[in-house]
């Protein structure tokens, strides 16, 4: 029996305001989870992550299993002690990383055999192995092991992939329970961009029973309108009393559109990765700091922003200088800004849902970018 509790506190249209409660803390939803692939959110300290508003982070089962390995993490009592993060952690199952290996993997009914990207050794990973690894990591949310359906995929390929993932979902459930793990276990809805396959996947997962439901395979190159169509299809079918997690999707616009379609949880490397490439997110769009127009710009990244970089007065000209000189401080300050922006965006959406003003919030979000608000189902542009 999982110790996760989910309370749905308010709705506004399809947007949902809720709270996840774990023994290690609470998470207000909708929530964005910074990604700590190797047990670290690149460039910042755990206490800085907490200070900028994040309440839960994501760890990568696949990479942590390969390096440093379970013995080292086990010596620390799990990933929380290893990474010095005392809040909730979600660990992915490794399925997406195996998917990304493409030609270096072989998929069978039992699982996936692949060449390790670290040393080339042959490694096997299946549902049972993934559940054992995540038990050692001692994460608060465990993800089932699944096959991430590629895009594009024919309906037949998507169907066979979805059916394999359903069989693996049952094995994940059985292995998780057999280990006596009381962490939350989330199922993952697959089926590509085929509504009937998505429905069948969700029906099968609900028959097994999970603490939450993730929507996978929608950050693999599909057009935005097809992703949104799948979210719209799933919204009335997903159980209202369970949290919903859209995996790997992360432009600011994607977060707003996901929340508008009933999503509670998001993760993406975009705010941290883009910061390392000199792309800083703001309410009016993206500041690409390598652009020559910022060479003598005395403004902060976003005037009035409360992040450490902006509130301390670091100018765009200074950040551009640091970036051009490959100084470590540039990605550190950029990461602090981008994650602050993402977490504030989520906080603003939570407040708008609670006050019944999400429609107005969404309209003002696009207006600040000089963009037209895209219509939701039933609306006209």
Curated annotation (Swiss-Prot):
Which transformation does this protein catalyse, written as a reaction? Answer: 7-aminomethyl-7-carbaguanine + guanosine(34) in tRNA = 7-aminomethyl-7-carbaguanosine(34) in tRNA + guanine
Q: Which residues lie within the region annotated RNA binding?
A: 248-254, 272-276
HAMAP family linked to this entry: Q_tRNA_Tgt (MF_00168)
This protein's encoding gene:
tgt
Q: What is the lineage of its organism?
A: Bacteria, Pseudomonadati, Pseudomonadota, Gammaproteobacteria, Lysobacterales
Q: Which UniProt keywords apply?
A: Glycosyltransferase, Metal-binding, Queuosine biosynthesis, Transferase, tRNA processing, Zinc
Entry protein name: Queuine tRNA-ribosyltransferase
Active site residues per record: 92, 267
BP GO terms, sorted: queuosine biosynthetic process; tRNA wobble guanine modification; tRNA-guanine transglycosylation
Species assigned in the record: Xanthomonas axonopodis pv. citri (strain 306)
Q: What class of enzyme is it?
A: transferase
């Amino acid at each position: 029996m999982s110790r996760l509790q989910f309370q749905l506190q308010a709705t506004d249209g399809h947007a949902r305001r809720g709270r996840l409660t774990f023994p290690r803390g609470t998470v207000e939803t909708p929530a964005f989870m910074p990604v700590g692939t190797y047990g670290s959110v690149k460039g910042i300290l755990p206490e800085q992550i907490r200070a900028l508003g994040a309440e839960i982070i994501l760890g990568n089962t696949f990479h942590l299993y390969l390096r440093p390995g379970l013995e080292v993490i086990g010596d620390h009592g799990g990933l929380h002690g290893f990474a010095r993060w005392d809040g909730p952690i979600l660990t992915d199952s490794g399925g997406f990383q195996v998917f990304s290996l493409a030609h270096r993997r072989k998929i069978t009914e039992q699982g996936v055999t692949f060449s390790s990207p670290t040393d080339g050794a042959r490694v096997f990973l299946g549902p049972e192995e993934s559940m054992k690894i995540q038990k050692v990591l001692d994460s608060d949310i465990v993800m089932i092991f699944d096959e991430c359906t590629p895009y594009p995929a024919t309906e037949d390929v998507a169907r066979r992939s979805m059916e394999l993932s359903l069989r693996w979902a049952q094995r994940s459930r059985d292995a998780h329970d057999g280990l006596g793990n009381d962490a939350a276990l989330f199922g993952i809805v697959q089926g590509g961009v085929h509504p009937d396959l998505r429905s069948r996947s969700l029906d099968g997962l609900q028959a097994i029973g999970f603490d939450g439901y993730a929507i996978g395979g929608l950050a693999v190159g599909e057009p935005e309108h097809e992703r949104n169509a799948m979210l719209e299809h799933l919204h009335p079918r997903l159980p209202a009393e369970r949290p919903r997690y859209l995996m790997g999707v992360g432009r600011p616009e994607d977060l707003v559109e996901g929340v508008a379609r009933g999503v509670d949880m998001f993760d993406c490397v975009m705010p941290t990765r883009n910061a390392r490439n000199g792309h800083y997110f703001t309410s009016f769009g993206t500041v690409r700091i390598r652009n020559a127009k910022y060479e003598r710009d005395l403004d902060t990244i976003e005037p009035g922003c409360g992040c450490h970089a902006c509130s301390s007065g670091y100018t765009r000209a200074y950040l551009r200088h640091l970036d051009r000189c490959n100084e470590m401080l540039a990605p550190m300050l950029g990461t602090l800004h981008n994650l602050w922006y993402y977490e504030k965006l989520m906080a603003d959406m939570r407040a708008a849902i609670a006050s019944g003003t999400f429609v107005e919030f969404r309209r003002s979000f696009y207006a600040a970018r000089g963009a037209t608000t895209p219509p939701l189902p039933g609306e006209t542009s």
